[in-house]
A protein has these predicted regions:
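Catalytic cysteine-centered active loop of the rhodanese-like fold, especially the PTP/DSP P-loop
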Residues: 36-96
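Phosphate-binding P-loop
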Residues: 61-64, 109-116
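Conserved nucleotide-sensing/catalytic segment adjacent to the nucleotide-binding pocket
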Residues: 137-207
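Conserved NTP phosphate-binding and transfer environment spanning the P-loop NTPase/kinase superfamily
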Residues: 208-214, 218-315
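A short glycine-rich beta-strand->turn/loop micro-motif centered on a GG-aromatic cluster
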Residues: 87-104, 144-149
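Short glycine-/polar-rich loops that comprise or flank the Walker A/P-loop
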Residues: 2-4, 115, 209-213
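Glycine-rich phosphate-binding P-loop
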Residues: 76-80, 118-137
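Positively charged, proline/Ser/Thr-rich regional signature most characteristic
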Residues: 1-56
Length: 315
């Protein structure tokens, strides 16, 4: 679960021992053995918990009332025993009934709810991510799928990003953000393929994206080149060249050679031009069959508050 702290009660060997005792000698003896292991770790566990509590207490954004939310796999003895222990220390534990299993059901169910999704689409370099950030800044409901996936979606998408979350974590993060929204209001997302790097967009959510209203951002080639240069010229040459080589079969030998040499010589406009045609063709292919598209020309426009009125006019 997002922002949770993992405090294992048992390691793999201990779990195996407890499981074996449970099968051969029954639940009672397995519980006793588990308590022996737990007793040896109680001090360390409490230290970790109190460190987290101290960190929260010094947070200026804290709520007045403090509860410790505890969960385990199915809401059984592990979470219940920790809750009992915390009660002895006059703390306020809350256990998640049904545990993480129930939480995951809630996560997956949340993607099936009917949502008013608005997809921001456009060719590479039209500033879709910056536009989404602008909408977020002005309190529009937005889901930053690339931000949550720690990947921009292209062969260059992992540059400068943190390690990608697991697909399960990715789904949990999206669901937690959706929980804050009114589904009857517009929810803005950037157009994506089904996979963002190694993260897969939840199937039900992606289906809603495919059938949603779309705003296609139009910008001049000059604007798009500037956008790409500002985004990618800051990275190491070796990283950029590795990214180009991953799509060399699609670029072809001539464009691959131009891109690699241009990176080496820091001719960023040539680098971007050499890959732009490839990504434009990919975009046109993905656009086939899409309907309900409104065009929004932002050529030479500053991405500031003045754009919001233009967006509202095309909705």
């Amino acid at each position: 679960m997002p922002n949770s702290i993992n405090i294992p009660l048992f390691d793999n060997d201990e779990r195996s021992i407890i499981g074996t005792i449970y099968k051969k000698e029954g639940r009672k003896k397995a519980v006793i053995e588990g308590l022996k292991f737990f007793e040896n770790k109680m001090e360390l566990l409490l230290d970790n918990l109190f460190m987290s509590i101290d960190s929260y207490e010094t947070n200026p954004k804290k709520n007045n009332e403090f509860f410790i939310k505890i969960y385990c796999s199915r809401g059984g003895m592990r979470s219940q025993s920790i809750a009992w222990l915390l009660e002895k220390y006059k703390l306020n534990p809350i256990t998640l009934k049904g545990g993480y299993k129930i939480y995951r059901k809630w996560v997956l169910d949340s993607f099936s709810k009917k949502m008013n999704i608005v997809v921001i689409s456009g060719k590479t370099g039209t500033g879709k991510t910056r536009l989404l950030s602008l909408l977020e800044k002005y309190k529009y409901q937005t889901i930053d799928l690339e931000g949550f996936a720690c990947h921009r979606g292209s062969t260059f998408g992992g540059l400068g990003m943190k390690k990608q979350p697991s697909n399960e974590q990715f789904e949990n993060i999206i669901a937690e953000k959706l929980k804050l929204f009114k589904c009857s209001n517009d929810i803005f997302v950037e157009a994506e393929s089904a996979n963002i790097g190694k993260c897969k967009i939840p199937h039900e959510f992606f289906n809603q994206m495919k059938n949603s209203r779309r705003i296609e951002i139009l910008r001049s080639e000059s604007n798009r080149l500037d956008e790409l240069i500002n985004t990618y010229s800051v990275f190491k040459k070796e990283e950029l060249q590795e990214s180009v080589l991953r799509i060399k079969k699609r670029l072809g030998p001539q464009r691959t050679k131009i891109a690699l040499e241009s990176i080496n010589n820091e001719k960023w406009d040539l680098v971007c031009r050499s890959v732009l045609d490839y990504y434009d063709k990919c975009y046109e292919f993905e656009k086939v069959g899409k309907t309900n598209i409104k065009l929004l020309d932002l050529t030479d426009k500053k991405y500031d508050e003045s754009i919001l009125e233009l967006i509202n006019n095309v909705l």
